[in-house]
């Protein structure tokens, strides 16, 4: 009898414990949202960068689909970067003036640039012709480049010291490019007129790209070039605004920001409209695909701390200057050895694209809370030998991959003017951020940081809609479904937007 009573008592205690555990688990999966408490108003634009490379030339299998995706996105602040591996596609004056003539040539550059400007018509763009002609540097080696414009060359740039240390020669080069696209042409160094017929609006121009890597330009030299370039380009296009800094590794060089953002280091009247910098998650050589979900988000956390630190510098020295983080992505360890002889690109698992997309979504959302102006995903097209792991489209046909579809999901559902409201959620593997959009809709962004499913309870979601990108959507657009309850299912690396009824 006594045994039976004890057994009954233990059974009751067990049921109570289990009930409490279940209740706690349910509570742990429940998001608490205070829709009446606005913590910040977003000013962040989700966008991307388009890097010039041969697959984007007319007539390729990639060109039409890739630019159709850009056109359909309808994003602002799209960044366009002709850069160093393809001198004939990115440098407009490959040889110095000689024997009474100059060597300006936009024959190959124009079609690609015009296609970009047409695909982004009606929206703001950022141009960055990032590569300074090699002959403008003091160097014993002559500038060499392949005859084939499609052949990548990583040895075009060398040398550190400009042959014109004032930076005026470089500034005039950039001013003439800007004039080519905005003023119908320019007058060259020898007084000859070159007509283009172009009268595009170029609202933003970024001065150089990752200067600490390209020619190892320090803060002092960069600021000198920036001041000369902006002064010359403002005369051509007074309405154009400018981006400066553009560091690849912002956490390594706080002095660069301290120096550049201090007005006393600039010529009087030179505007400091925006600063920019970049972030890529990069796994170690021996890191497995399964482990990347941990390291990518850990690296993202470190970068966000860097952003907060830089913002403190900016607010102290130049509070009216904006900030654009205009390259956000991931680079595989394999891509870092793509230039090795005989290198063969390793297959990229499908889950990688979803992981990289989820990481971008997380950084984008956190940048809205910090108050950053632009969060630009990188990059439209990559392909074997040219950072394939960074691509946002299939390099065989130009159709968007999950990274692009995550960007579109974010762009179509969130933007400047959204009210970010108080959101509490204890589960660290799933990120949640609730907003009231400019048109009054209540939305919750959910990001699964892990390659395994979770169920989350969003109060009031029943009758609403869930739009998402995950492994099940593949290379297709975001999927949508009506919600029958407050319970939200998240597949591995899911990026989901829940719109309340």
Indicate residue ranges for each PLM-predicted region.
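Bacterial N-terminal signal peptides
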Residues: 8-19
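Mature N-terminal, pre-catalytic/accessory segment of carbohydrate-active enzymes
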Residues: 25-76
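Short, acidic/polar
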Residues: 56-70, 254-265, 357-364
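Substrate-binding cleft and catalytic face of glycoside hydrolase catalytic domains
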Residues: 73-296
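Glycoside hydrolase catalytic-domain groove-lining segments
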Residues: 282-339, 398-399
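Aromatic/acidic polysaccharide-binding cleft in carbohydrate-active enzymes
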Residues: 325-414, 418-431
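Carbohydrate-binding surface patches
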Residues: 426-462, 469-471, 493-497
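C-terminal beta-strand-rich structural cap/linker in extracellular carbohydrate-active enzymes
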Residues: 479-501
């Amino acid at each position: 009898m006594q045994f039976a009573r004890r057994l009954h008592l233990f059974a009751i205690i067990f049921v109570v414990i289990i009930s409490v555990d279940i209740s706690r688990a349910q509570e742990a999966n429940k998001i608490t949202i205070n829709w009446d408490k606005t913590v910040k108003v977003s000013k962040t634009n989700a966008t991307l960068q388009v890097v010039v490379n041969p697959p984007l030339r007319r007539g390729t299998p990639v060109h039409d689909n890739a630019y159709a995706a850009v056109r359909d996105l309808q994003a602002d602040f799209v960044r366009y970067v002709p850069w160093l591996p393809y001198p004939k596609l990115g440098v407009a004056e490959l040889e110095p003036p000689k024997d009474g003539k100059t060597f300006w040539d936009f024959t190959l550059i124009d079609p690609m640039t015009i296609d970009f400007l047409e695909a982004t018509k009606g929206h703001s763009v950022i141009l960055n012709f990032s590569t300074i002609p090699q002959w403008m540097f003091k160097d014993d080696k002559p500038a060499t480049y392949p005859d084939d414009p499609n052949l990548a060359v990583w040895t075009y740039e060398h040398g550190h010291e400009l042959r014109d240390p004032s930076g005026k020669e470089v500034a005039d080069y950039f001013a003439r490019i800007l004039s080519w696209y905005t003023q119908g042409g320019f007058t060259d160094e020898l007084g000859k007129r070159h007509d283009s017929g172009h009268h595009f609006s170029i609202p933003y121009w970024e001065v150089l790209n990752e200067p600490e890597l390209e020619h190892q330009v320090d803060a002092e030299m960069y600021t000198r070039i920036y001041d000369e370039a902006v002064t010359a380009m403002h005369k051509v296009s007074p309405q154009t605004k400018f981006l400066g800094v553009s560091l690849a590794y912002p956490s390594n060089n706080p002095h660069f920001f301290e120096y550049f953002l201090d007005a006393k280091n600039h010529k009087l009247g030179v505007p400091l409209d925006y600063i920019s910098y970049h972030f890529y998650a990069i796994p170690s050589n021996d890191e497995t695909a399964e482990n990347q979900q941990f390291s990518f988000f850990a690296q993202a956390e470190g970068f966000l701390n860097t952003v907060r630190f830089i913002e403190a510098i900016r607010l102290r020295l130049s509070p009216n200057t904006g900030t654009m983080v205009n390259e956000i992505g991931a680079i595989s360890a394999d891509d870092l050895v793509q230039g090795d002889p005989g290198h063969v690109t390793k297959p990229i698992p499908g889950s990688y694209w979803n992981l990289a997309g989820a990481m971008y979504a997380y950084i984008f959302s956190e940048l809205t809370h910090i108050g950053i102006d632009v969060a630009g995903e990188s990059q439209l097209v990559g392909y074997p030998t040219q950072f394939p792991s960074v691509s946002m489209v299939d390099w065989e046909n130009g159709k968007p991959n999950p990274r692009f579809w995550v960007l579109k999901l974010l762009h179509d559902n969130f933007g400047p003017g959204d009210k970010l409201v108080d959101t509490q959620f204890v589960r660290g593997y799933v990120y949640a951020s609730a907003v009231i959009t400019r048109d009054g809709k209540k939305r919750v962004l959910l990001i699964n940081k892990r390659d395994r499913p979770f169920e989350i309870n969003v109060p009031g979601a029943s009758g609403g809609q869930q739009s998402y990108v995950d492994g099940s959507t593949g290379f297709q657009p975001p999927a949508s479904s009506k919600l029958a309850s407050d319970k939200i299912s998240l597949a591995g690396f899911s990026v989901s937007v829940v719109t309340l009824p």
